[in-house]
Amino acid sequence: MEDFVFGTLATDNLKLLHHRTRRRGIQHAYQIEPRDPKPDEPITLSVTIGPHLKPARVVCHLNGELLDFEKREMLWDTLVWGYVEKWTLTLAGKPDGTVIRYRISAIEADGRETFADFPEVQTSIEIATSAFFRGESLPDLQPGDRAKGNAFALSVDTLTPPEWAKHAVIYQVFVDRFFPGKGNDWKQPDDLLGFFGGTLWGVIEKLDYIEDLGVNCIWLSPIFDSPSHHGYDATDIYNVAERYGGNEALHALVDAAHARRIRILLDFVCSHISDEHPVFADAHANEDSLYRDWFSFDDSEVGYRSFFGSPRMPQLDYTNPAARKWMIDAARYWIREFDVDGYRLDYAIGPTPDFWTDFWLGCKAEKADSFCFGEVIDAPDVQKHYVGRLDGCLDFFSADALRRTYGFKTWDEAHLERFLERHAAYFTDDFIMPTFLDNHDMDRLLFLNGGDKDALKKAAQTQMHLPGPPLIYYGTEVGLTHEKSSQEGGGIHVSRVPMVWGHGQDQDLLDFYKKIIAERKLRK
């Protein structure tokens, strides 16, 4: 059985496509040194030029000027079977608070101009991944528009990730499955795609439990209006769904949690919304809609760019300034009006590269110590692109290593130790990477290892010694598991079972978690 933690890199063919696409055409992909420039520090931009592009010039479009790159290095790449050029440009240092906005292009001798990043990597990867999971052969590379490219932005500042986040112990609450509250019983839907009735009032009633566990930060699954149980397809990003208790319940939860020195993080989806959202419905039905350019309509089977080809989740096009402002304003609103402490950012690799610079600065303007970390399920070198644009990323690679060792048991502990040492050395201390053993999109670790509680304890003990803040998926600490695999017909929602309370909890495992969390806090 495969885990498929890395969906877009799930097979050798997908990995090969990923690599080859990033070596073709002209790719900048935030190759910046230093990655998070400080005031007055020179900044070097790099691009790679693939075998089939022969530029006479490579230029940076900055403040109405064209600044020339210099060819620095010739590299052989066997996987694209050709030479790849590296070009660089060093910019003078800038004062604190400067946002550098730029584009990069390659100009050939005949005047044809190709803008980075081309080919557009993410679209190609999404289309290929969708085909793989549908059991279809990988499609041809989708090159995109060479005249479009990406806009890039980097902030010169002294901002740093919040110190509190480095010492956090985070608890992931899937709200619909945690606790109903107010004396209500669980609802009885036909399957896990239905609504079970968990609410924010229920979370408030269980704050004693969460605090006693040793947790000082809660990540809530999406709570906005949505037609689904998971909420990753919002129909209103300015209101908490009434089934969770509405805005009143969120206010009450934040106040109650803060009184216990527990932070609250929202799950925020910038990449896409629901096809039932009024903004998209208007854009879809009316070519003259004010919102038409907020989305990328095309001649695909779906008719528009969407989350891995799902017609239910159209993706927003943040080259449109109004769409960008709308989403960032919403993020600022929840921090300003509800005092939330930051965001777990769903599918952070989806929006255009410059979006996160503006998003992060907007959140920091509302609350300097807000914590914004992305779900970036991609290679570590790609995750590094988010240094200086977000506070961190979820650590999918340590999760994969722990699951291979204590779930599938295909790695021994010596292999795990070597990997974790190298992995920690690859990232800086100021890029915060929450660690986890399982989450809402994968099988629980206790299911993978056939109920081996000792192996789960070893995994949790190891997790507590990793640099990043530990993140605990609700119920893992009490032995919650499920019957079917997500990879054998169960679907990715199989782990989203209702939380068990009272005698249904594994008290020995719960006591163990309390112990190792307390020990971590003493070390930190």
Which residues make up each language-model segment?
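Substrate-binding/active-site clefts of carbohydrate-active enzymes
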Residues: 170, 174-216, 223-337, 358-366, ...
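Glycan-association/targeting regions that enable binding to alpha-glucans and other polysaccharides
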Residues: 1-167
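Active-site clefts of carbohydrate-active enzymes
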Residues: 428-451
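Conserved, mostly hydrophobic/aromatic
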Residues: 47, 173, 210, 220, ...
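Active-site beta-loop-alpha junctions enriched in small/polar residues
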Residues: 176-178, 223-225, 269-271, 348-350, ...
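Active-site-proximal helices and loops of the catalytic beta/alpha 8
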Residues: 258-262, 280, 336, 346-429, ...
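Core domains of carbohydrate- and sulfate-ester-processing enzymes
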Residues: 127-131, 135, 143, 161-162, ...
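Hydrophobic faces of well-ordered beta-strands that scaffold small-molecule active sites
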Residues: 169-171, 218-220, 264-266, 343, ...
